């Protein structure tokens, strides 16, 4: 409050008052969270005390500020409610390279848009069957991307498990698969700038895409170092998926166990957000890989693995917790893999309608 008055003459005066709102120095935040599936009751149960119950012991965290915070309990029939934020994000997305077009069509579940993308896709392939982000000009050297080709094959295959309309036409798919196969075998070379050596990680992504079509044999795995501790999380997820599909892989059970242990050791749930301990080194953006896509693809990779069954709800809520404030993830690839993962989870575990009442 500032006051000023003229001491001579007319004695004019003025006053300025500024109101400032003081907010707590420590904002509220989720310190710990849990997710449970409530046991169902029987329709004819009259006595509420006889119904199945869930109890959870709680206590104030050490050093909690008096009078701040509390418990928040929410109930919902599905963990992913419509993904409206992702749909809005895709509907307003303005860019149009091949990856972005494909991600948008599949992410929106728009079969007509996907059909138009597929119609033009052959013009994006080089002479070896590998896809470019933009159509190459006549006379250009073959510069198709093994990374983009693997992504298109894997994403369309995953989407087709729910809606066959998103499968690639057989002739186009075979042409792309053959290009990837030659790349994995070393008969086809692609050199691109990268901030670190990435050939083995690129081969793992290609093998994961090829394994979906049953084209990976034990012989093709022989050139890999099979050292997941050295790999980024995206490569470990690829390795786990490959091993689950290639049943005659050498030392398969040992490698499966090792890959699972590496992934579990990197997992951490902070409040309601899933993070990896290697997050700072997992952003392989030039290969379209990062924390968001890793979380989504891990969920897909372990969806039907009994050893991960108890972890699935935590993986789902942790994946959702990685969304930005607009209810979407940061990139086209993350939004596509995230939506595919949550749709697959809902189809497998949330297909039965929920009704009745719950008391808390």
Question: What does each model-identified segment do?
Answer:
Residues 1-197, 203-208, 218-222, 285-287:
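Extended, solvent-exposed functional surface patches
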Residues 1-7, 11-14, 52-53, 59-63, ...:
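Long, domain-scale non-catalytic interaction/scaffolding regions in large secretory-pathway
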């Amino acid at each position: 409050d500032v006051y000023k008055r003229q001491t001579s003459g007319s004695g004019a005066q003025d006053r300025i008052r500024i109101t400032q709102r003081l907010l707590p120095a420590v904002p509220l935040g989720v310190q710990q969270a849990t997710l449970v599936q409530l046991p169902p009751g029987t329709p004819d149960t009259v006595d509420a005390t006889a119904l199945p119950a869930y109890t959870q012991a709680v206590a104030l965290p050490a050093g909690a500020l008096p009078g701040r915070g509390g418990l928040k309990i929410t109930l919902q029939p599905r963990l992913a409610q419509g993904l409206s934020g992702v749909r809005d994000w895709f509907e307003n997305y303005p860019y149009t390279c091949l990856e972005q077009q494909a991600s948008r069509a599949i992410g929106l579940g728009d079969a007509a848009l996907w059909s138009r993308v597929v119609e033009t896709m052959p013009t994006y392939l080089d002479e070896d069957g590998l896809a470019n982000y933009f159509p190459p000009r006549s006379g250009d050297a073959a510069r198709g991307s093994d990374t983009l080709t693997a992504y298109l094959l894997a994403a369309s295959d995953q989407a087709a498990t729910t809606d066959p309309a998103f499968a690639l036409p057989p002739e186009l798919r075979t042409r792309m698969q053959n290009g990837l196969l030659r790349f994995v075998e070393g008969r086809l070379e692609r050199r691109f700038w990268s901030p670190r050596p990435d050939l083995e990680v690129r081969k793992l992504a290609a093998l994961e895409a090829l394994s979906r079509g049953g084209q990976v044999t034990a012989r093709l795995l022989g050139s890999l170092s099979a050292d997941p501790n050295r790999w980024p999380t995206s490569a470990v997820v690829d390795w786990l998926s490959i091993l689950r599909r290639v049943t005659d892989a050498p030392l398969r059970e040992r490698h499966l166990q090792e890959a699972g242990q590496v992934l579990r050791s990197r997992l951490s749930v902070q409040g309601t957000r899933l993070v990896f301990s290697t997050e700072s080194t997992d952003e392989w953006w030039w290969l379209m890989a990062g924390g968001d896509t890793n979380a989504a693809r891990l969920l897909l990779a372990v969806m039907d693995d009994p050893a991960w069954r108890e972890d699935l709800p935590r993986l789902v809520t942790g994946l959702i917790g990685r969304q930005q404030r607009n209810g979407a993830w940061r990139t086209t690839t993350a939004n596509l893999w995230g939506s595919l993962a949550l749709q697959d989870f809902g189809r497998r575990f949330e297909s039965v309608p929920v009704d009745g009442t719950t008391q808390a």
